[in-house]
A protein has these predicted regions:
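Hydrophobic core of transmembrane alpha-helices in multi-pass small-molecule transporters
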Residues: 106, 112-132, 337-353, 519-538
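Extracellular/periplasmic helix-loop-helix junction of adjacent transmembrane segments
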Residues: 38-71
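Glycine-rich segments within core transmembrane alpha-helices of 12-TM secondary carriers
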Residues: 130, 152-177, 200, 326, ...
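Central cavity-lining transmembrane alpha-helices of secondary-active solute carriers
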Residues: 59-78, 97-99, 164, 286-299
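Cytoplasmic membrane-interface "Motif A"-like loop-to-helix N-cap segments
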Residues: 82-94, 305-316
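Helix-loop-helix hairpin linking two adjacent transmembrane segments in secondary transporters
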Residues: 162-208
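C-terminal ends and interior cores of transmembrane alpha-helices
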Residues: 47, 94-113, 318-337, 510-517
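Extracytoplasmic gate region of multi-pass secondary transporters
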Residues: 34-35, 240-288, 327, 354-389, ...
Length: 623
């Protein structure tokens, strides 16, 4: 054992790690492309359909990405324990590569109709299934090649792959956007990152074809000790099912919520809450991933010295203790004006108790129609802190009080015919009240066609506009078709019109809250994001070795894959939507952090009390 620990890595071992890691990076790259490019995919495949149909498609696509992964773990885990590690994760990479490449070629709904979103969802399901089988295969394969005393170090290279896949997807998207420009990228350029996956697929398959079967699996098959029913043995026998449950709740759930908080939720927080420009946020996250990724290998190596459990539990504890101050530091660095407003401005929503719902919206397509939900959804989208007081009378609309101003909300169902006008009026009044109380809102310019100018001036008395003076000033004449396509006029309003003057009125359009680029502290943000990534590396770096060491060879692929993908696909994958819903329910942009903190705490307690230390186990003697 001492010799194995001190001997340098052989050429064969390097090839095993490189081949396994490269293929897994490729699969994560493919998986993350969908999330990063969701807005363009939605516009191409879903936007032509009625809202209900669009919502069903979006929900199915979401479910296919995250919720299908455990089923992939069952299918390919069983296959890996029956026929071998090498051939199983060769199949997973072929499935992932094929499904990703075809997304880049798939015609949109405008060309092939409803077949487009249906095929897209089927391809996304294939991606989820393949990813469900890939990780367990790669981790098991590498661990079974690793010498005793180096499994943490060897498998830590696999742990870098999810982060490197995310990093690679962000870099490729940014480069293609830079080369093509935003318009061309939105129209067709978003397909290029999917098509480029063919290159990675070819290299990965070529390398994996040259690999040999895992020595532990080959020895087990030679001795006739393989499992004939891995699923039944892994989850139908209590002694093994108990290990799977302990792996899930004593390790993986906490790892998953810290992983998603440190990478996905941090990115969402920057763009969705702090309103930092999306491209800038992607660059900052990419920088933090680049700075932090080496710690996966460091903590994997360290776990061979001091154990898997102390490092994972320390990462969970640090995350629990520091998430609130770290995310508050992100606010002060990313949007100082918002941070100051959060300390001085607080709205009060008064509504009937039955009017306020929990706003769980994983697909981003749900519509909130009660007056309370409309008010709280608007405030949450604009990162406005608020309290909900459920003392309103039944049947009366909710009100929003900001300073000494009270604004009435509306019920979208009861006011169906007028809901668009009521929504515009509610948002405008609320924004004016927020701005008057010092909230950092910016009002964009408004483009107003001549036929609507008088009504616009009358509807915005706070601007002190003069219609005659505007008509006498600068104007642009637009053809009727452009007025309709630009949504300045409806088709009915443009009937019989050849062209019309359009006036651009400064600071008279929609209100927005955007982080001022001049005040965004890049270095501070990258520093905080890097700390969050280091927490990720602490909980994630040693976990592959831990999971491999918990299960015997005969059911290892199956046994470790299912808890890993339930934890990461369900508990982790649902984190952004659940955290946002929690923040919306409490009117506090930080309240959603209780989701990862509570689950990390549960894992910490269970892990400390019941999870065994596994670093000294001989995985070849467990059968």
């Amino acid at each position: 054992v001492g010799t194995a620990k001190s001997a340098p890595m052989t050429g064969e071992q390097k090839k095993v790690i490189f081949a396994s890691s490269l293929g897994t990076v490729f699969e994560w790259y493919d998986f993350y492309l969908y999330g990063s490019l969701a807005i363009y995919i939605g516009a191409t495949f879903f936007s032509q359909y009625p809202e209900t149909t669009r919502n069903i498609f979006a929900l199915l696509a979401f479910a296919a990405g995250f919720l299908v992964r455990p089923f992939g773990a069952l299918v390919f885990g069983r296959l890996g324990d029956l026929v071998g590690r090498k051939y199983t994760f060769l199949v997973t990479i072929l499935i992932m590569g094929f499904s990703t490449f075809v997304v880049g070629l798939l015609p949109g709904a405008a060309t092939i109709g409803i077949a487009a979103p249906i095929i897209l969802i089927l391809l996304r399901m294939l991606q989820g299934l393949a990813l469900g089988g890939e990780y367990g295969g790669a981790a098991t394969y590498v661990a079974e090649h690793a010498p005793h005393g180096k499994r943490g170090y060897f498998t830590s290279w696999i742990q870098t792959t999810a982060t490197l896949g995310l990093f690679l997807s962000l870099v490729v998207i940014l480069l293609v956007q830079f080369m093509l420009g935003k318009e061309a990228f939105a129209e067709w350029g978003w397909r290029i990152p999917f098509l480029l996956s063919a290159i990675l697929l070819g290299v990965s398959v070529w390398i994996r074809l040259k690999m040999n079967e895992s020595p532990a699996f080959a020895k087990m098959k030679e001795e006739g000790k393989g499992s004939k029913a891995p699923l039944t043995e892994a989850f139908g026998q209590w002694r093994n099912a108990k290990i799977a449950l302990l792996a899930l709740f004593g390790a993986v759930v906490g790892q998953a919520v810290v992983w998603y908080s440190g990478q996905f939720y941090a990115l969402f927080f920057l763009t969705g809450v702090l309103k930092v420009d999306g491209q800038s946020a992607n660059i900052m996250v990419a920088c933090s991933l680049l700075l932090g990724t080496g710690f996966f290998v460091f903590f994997g190596w360290l776990s061979d010295k001091i154990g898997r459990k102390p490092i994972i539990m320390a990462g969970l504890l640090l995350a629990m203790l520091t998430y609130f101050p770290l995310f508050k530091a992100l606010t002060w660095a990313g949007n100082p004006a918002l941070a100051q407003a959060q300390d001085t401005i607080r709205a009060t929503v008064t509504a009937a108790p039955e009017d306020c719902k929990f706003q769980f919206n994983p697909t981003g397509t749900a519509k909130f129609t009660t007056s309370c939900d409309i008010a709280t959804s608007f405030l949450t989208r604009n990162s406005v802190p608020y309290d909900v007081v459920t003392t309103g009378a039944a049947g009366t609309p909710a009100t929003v009080k900001i300073g000494d101003k009270t604004i009435s909300s509306y019920d979208a169902v009861a006011s169906a015919d007028q809901s668009k006008a009521l929504d515009a009026a509610f948002q405008k009044e609320t924004n004016l009240a927020l701005q008057a109380n010092g909230y950092p809102l910016v009002r964009a310019a408004a483009k107003v066609p001549d036929s609507k100018l008088d009504a616009f001036v009358a509807a915005n008395p706070e601007l002190g506009l003069d219609a005659a003076a505007i008509r006498a000033g600068e104007k642009a004449t637009m053809p009727a078709a452009d007025l309709v396509s630009g949504k300045l006029l409806t088709a009915e309003e443009a009937a019989g019109v050849t062209d019309m003057p359009v006036y651009t009125i400064d600071k008279a359009g929609p209100f927005t809250m955007v982080a001022d680029p001049a005040n965004v502290k890049w270095i501070s943000i990258i520093a905080v994001l890097t700390v969050l990534v280091i927490y990720v590396t602490m909980v994630y770096g040693p976990i592959a070795a831990l999971l491999v060491e918990l299960f015997p060879t005969r059911i290892r692929y199956t046994g470790m894959s299912l808890p890993y993908h339930i934890g990461n696909g369900w508990f982790g994958g649902l984190l952004p939507a659940t955290a946002f819903a929690m923040s919306a329910a409490q009117g506090d942009i930080y309240y959603g952090l209780w989701y990862p903190i509570v689950f990390a705490g549960i894992t910490l307690v269970i892990g400390l009390l019941f999870l065994p230390e596994t670093k000294d186990r001989d995985i070849h003697a467990m059968d």
